[in-house]
């Protein structure tokens, strides 16, 4: 008999239907129309605005099939239209913009050497309002009462080898602050973060989640760094504290106050080597550092603040050499396999007992409980 090989391509008909509708719109409204760049952007934004707003659908396929969708659906439709046109587009977090609702989303488009922000996610019935704006910066700013600017988001695309270069000025105004949760909605893929010497404040969780960043400079102008500013930066071991009179210092991958009395952040270290004479571990200093396995806290430390080791779930063994320690709340939250080693009768033992944490006398000889750390084996 004759053997015949048959290749069957299975397609999602709903997606094919939606794509055909977009292509029909392109053929009728864009192809061969000799549009300017801005006219093209507006035509792209107009298509999702031709459907009603509806909270039940959040993708382009469901918007086109059911005739309505939310801002996520409008964004999805714009991105798919751009893909079919061979234009680069990506979603943008819009919920920090003035007047925006929680979870709002719109679109960034790169075309012919320019960046555009497209919006078609407004509520109402069709035809809904839409807009296209050429962007002169990929950063987003808020005006401050003192006439300077804070920066709240980056809307561009980065790769692991790129530098995120924070601008010193925008439209003649000085940039002085990185807002809380700058990282939320920002592209977090970069190798280096560079701050200008105009920055005075880095907000809470500002760079949280920049997991591939290995280095950031802290200029002498910085006077305040918020809690968790570098949380979940699991590769960030290089803090470059530059300039005379800097308020901060670094050593062995840990950021300190200038006198090294306060450990402020150690987002990537796995076995922290604390500076001599350190007295305080700041709030959230090592929070979300899943690299941590073993910690020895020197006798000089008298205060461990709230959530200092919050969600460091990989840590197994913490030795606290001091006896008169003040603990904040949730210091070792979600460190479920943790054993604390300290002096019997000390504040360390009391804290362990009150918080359901295993305790072992610091003077107790090693027992037959082995754990592997890198290429070596250690006793509990």
Per-segment meaning from a language model:
Residues 95, 99-112, 118, 122-123, ...:
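Extracellular adhesion/carbohydrate-binding repeat motifs centered on closely spaced tryptophans
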Residues 27, 31, 46-53, 83-87, ...:
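Sec-exported extracytoplasmic/periplasmic mature domains
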Residues 155, 184-187, 208-209, 232, ...:
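Glycine/tyrosine- and acidic-biased, solvent-exposed loop/turn segments at the edges of beta-strands
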Residues 47-105, 110:
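Active-site neighborhood of thiol-dependent amide/isopeptide-bond enzymes
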Residues 13-64:
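Secondary-structure boundary elements
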Residues 139-147, 159-176, 188-201, 210-224, ...:
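Structural signature of tandem-repeat unit edges
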Residues 1-5:
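Intrinsically disordered, low-complexity N-terminal segments that are enriched in acidic
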Residues 181, 203-206, 227-229, 282-285, ...:
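Consensus positions within tandem repeat domains that build extended binding/scaffold surfaces
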